[in-house]
């Protein structure tokens, strides 16, 4: 990705990765790619804000050198130690041995864990805490500790002169800058939030409280675009998401896991019945859809219908994995309907109910649609009763 100007004194020096298949080795980022963001503040003293994944080290070092134009950085500020942001840290530290590394106590613990206890001398470690400041000349960084958004060492840095928030992973988004420059922020930011940060809603609320007193003109996250417009909307989304509230309370996601197609047919039949009632319905085939999309859709909607086959006396694995993802991300406060299928011993509804009992404030609709291979008159009647319940609220 080309170097970009954020302001006269601040440059974007991050790198796009359009070849990565799975972010964190589990979430699809094709075809949109992902960006590893890094910034340079040019003043009397120079601060580099975070490094990038080791996959992108050489391009990043080249970007930094081009922006420096022969100068040498005074500081590398580490707001987040996850390897997609710290993977090139030591290469910059070795290239500029006089440069200090700025982090909090937990940052330096992780640096020693990742790179060895002797990777950095004590003289090179500049430890900061809540409210600490770092003057670069006309620019000054103020540090805000925001642990567990989404790692324990995470901190944000607020540049007081130009009112820029360097937000670490908060407000990040999937998508390389090259491929998604004109894409709306929310869809991939939502998928990123719920799958990466979503478990830590309380900690995100603490972050929002800390930054509510700040005048913010620009947000510079570690993934996705620099945000200069629509900041109130971005903050509103984060407030909503971090309280696990649906964006569309009357929308319904039907998530189905079908072995030979009968359960999928039932799910599609339910979708048609609901749409005839004027209900907005999303449908997701868990056997082929990347789970990160299904998880994001489940949080987006106010209601959820789960349709699963029974498999070897257990839940069909795609449904089991989906429910486990929802549990770990804090899924809660939803109304849920169940459809089960089993040619001789349908038991998926009981098994799904057991999984849902591990989540907070989940309310099940009374009607369960039970199939023995395919829809029949009895299960159609059950489905009509479930439709009535779904539309009654």
Predicted regions and their residues:
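Short, charged N-terminal beta->alpha structural module
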Residues: 255-277
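Active-site metal-binding motif and surrounding structural segment of the metallo-beta-lactamase
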Residues: 44, 55-102
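Conserved beta-strand hairpin/beta-sheet module of binuclear metal-dependent hydrolase folds
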Residues: 3-66, 156-159, 163-167, 263
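Short acidic active-site motifs
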Residues: 88, 290-294
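Metal-dependent phosphodiesterase/nuclease catalytic metal-binding core
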Residues: 40, 156-192, 197-220, 229-256
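Metallo-beta-lactamase
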Residues: 4-8, 102-154, 200-208
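FMN-binding flavodoxin-like domain, especially the glycine-rich phosphate-binding loop
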Residues: 177-219, 223-226, 269-284, 294-393
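Active-site neighborhood of phospho(di)ester-bond hydrolases with catalytic His/Asp-centered motifs
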Residues: 49-51, 73-81, 100-104, 165-168, ...
